[in-house]
């Protein structure tokens, strides 16, 4: 009987991936901005800090409003939240002026 060679580990090739050497950077690190070369302290620090703060605010603004209407279920699927609008008939106290004008229109039509 011939001995069978061990089967190649094909599943390792499909499921195990090589790690990428450099991860994707989504934002800049604050350490890069704080280390200014040999420039005079105080003159450019305020300008770079304000630019850096402006960039951070833009990043925060984008992420704050991005997924508010989407809910992730336990299975990992995204579900859109449906908003139910209330009509004026259900909430007449929202616009009391609309109620008085509607009553005046009905009186004049009679």
Curated annotation (Swiss-Prot):
Residues 65-85 have a biased composition (Basic residues). Residues 100-110 have a biased composition (Polar residues). It holds the Pfam family ATAD4. It comes from the Eukaryota. Residues 29-51, 65-110 are annotated as: Disordered. InterPro entries: PRR15 (IPR028237). Belongs to the PRR15 family. This is Proline-rich protein 15-like protein A.
